Amino acid sequence: GVMKAVQTVENVLDSKLKALDELENMGDEELEAIRERRLKQAKEHAHRTEQLRASGHGDYRTVTEEREFFAQVKTIVRVVAHFGRSATSRCEIVDGHLAKLAGQHLETKFIRVEAERTPYLADRLKIRVLPSIVLIKNNKTEHTIVGFEEMGGEDDFSTLVLEELLFKYNAIT
């Protein structure tokens, strides 16, 4: 057991030393090429982030019309849509968590939908309990989190609990 562990550690160290040797032996052109590639990737990432923010990612906006809902979701890969009602304590709890997550997960669009002002949509998505969080991927409903059951049934669940649930259902990456 101990010898095997020592051998494993030695192998890891050997491979790290070899990688360092390769770096030292690399010419200036190769290092410059790596630097250029990394810079290009960083610029592409910044541009993508800018595009996502421009299309409302990172914000948690309220939708009050069905037409607006469809416009918001039709071109977006991942959407987390909270169907709620103003001045309802459990909906306000969900709003707090989703507003935090929206800023952390730009790959997903987070919206709040006023259920009472979008009756056709709420009916079509079979919204019977508020809050309900509808997870949409490529214009299809993947899952609906109804009430607080999946978060443990209590009002004091953490943002992390909801985040892990959204990750489990592939609503965030």
Model-predicted regions and their roles:
Residues L52-R53, F69, V94, R124-L125, ...:
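Chalcogenol-based redox active-site neighborhoods
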